[in-house]
């Protein structure tokens, strides 16, 4: 009986060591992955759905009226929520693992929002996967001091119907769980792209 117990403990120890090694390899492989902008989906402005809008003229009168009211409101708040989809490419032959990330979103050199997301992703060796990140910020608050036209253009750029492009930098710092402990890479990885028509 004791021999069986010792054998079981030995098996668990070996399995745990292998699991930690797998987590280490997965974390390292993720640091070698390439992150690229893919798309923005699920865009809402003050609760108004702007997904799949091809042009301002394509908006129905009711939606347009709601947008005008939201822009003109003196409440000082204009929540913008969306899903940022990143393409993650793994150049390694082994799987890459991610347990979460910290992020900083900057648009035209202005910081819009920061945060931490606990979201697991696995990318197969020599493969790619889409990492969907749910984000949001108060467009009026972060655009304080700018003109109404600048605010409109920022929001319409997210919908792909803006008149002037917005330069976006999304900085990410991947987090990994190894042996029950959480670690992160020492510096942020920048993902840059432009929002326009």
Where would I find each of the regions flagged by the language model?
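Positively charged n-region of N-terminal signal peptides that target proteins for export
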Residues: 1-5
């Amino acid at each position: 009986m004791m021999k069986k117990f010792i054998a079981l403990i030995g098996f668990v120890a070996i399995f745990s060591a292998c699991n930690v090694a797998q987590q280490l390899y997965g974390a390292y492989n993720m640091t070698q992955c390439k992150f690229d902008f893919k798309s923005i989906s699920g865009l809402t402005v003050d609760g108004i759905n702007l997904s799949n809008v091809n042009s301002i003229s394509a908006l129905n009168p009711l939606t347009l009226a709601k947008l005008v009211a939201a822009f003109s409101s003196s409440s000082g708040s204009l929540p913008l929520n969306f899903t940022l989809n990143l393409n993650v490419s793994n150049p390694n032959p082994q799987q890459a693992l991610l347990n979460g990330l910290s992020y900083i979103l900057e648009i035209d050199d202005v910081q819009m929002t920061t945060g931490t997301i606990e979201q697991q992703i696995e990318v197969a060796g020599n493969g790619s996967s889409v990492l969907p990140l749910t984000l949001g910020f108060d467009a009026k608050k972060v655009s304080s001091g700018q003109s109404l036209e600048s605010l409109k253009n920022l929001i319409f750029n997210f919908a792909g119907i803006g008149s002037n492009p917005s330069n976006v930098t999304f900085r990410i710092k991947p987090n990994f769980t190894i042996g029950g402990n959480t670690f992160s890479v020492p510096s942020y990885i920048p993902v840059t792209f432009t929002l326009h028509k």
